[in-house]
Regions:
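A detector for short, charged/polar N-terminal pre-domain segments
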Residues: 1-5, 63
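Short amphipathic alpha-helical segments, especially helix-boundary/capping motifs
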Residues: 1, 10, 25-28
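Short aromatic/basic micro-patch
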Residues: 7-8, 44
Length: 67
């Protein structure tokens, strides 16, 4: 049972990503953004999905030896 995924609330995701709660709600309505689960009336996000979403926006700087 130790390998169960950690789930975050909408507020926790908002604080972690700096994406507003209204924006998260709009993304769900538009079926875009971070994958989520609806448990009755509660919305939960898997931590792994949130981290993957954040990583997908990562831009690696170009390394160049020419000046």
């Amino acid at each position: 049972m130790q390998n169960l995924p950690k789930y975050l609330t909408e507020r926790e995701v908002s604080e972690l990503t700096r994406i507003g709660m209204k924006t998260l709600q709009q993304h769900r309505w538009l079926k875009k953004g971070i994958a989520y689960s609806r448990l009755d009336r509660s919305i939960r996000y898997r931590l792994d999905d949130v981290l993957a979403f954040m990583e997908s926006g990562r831009i690696e700087p170009e390394t160049s030896n020419t000046h």
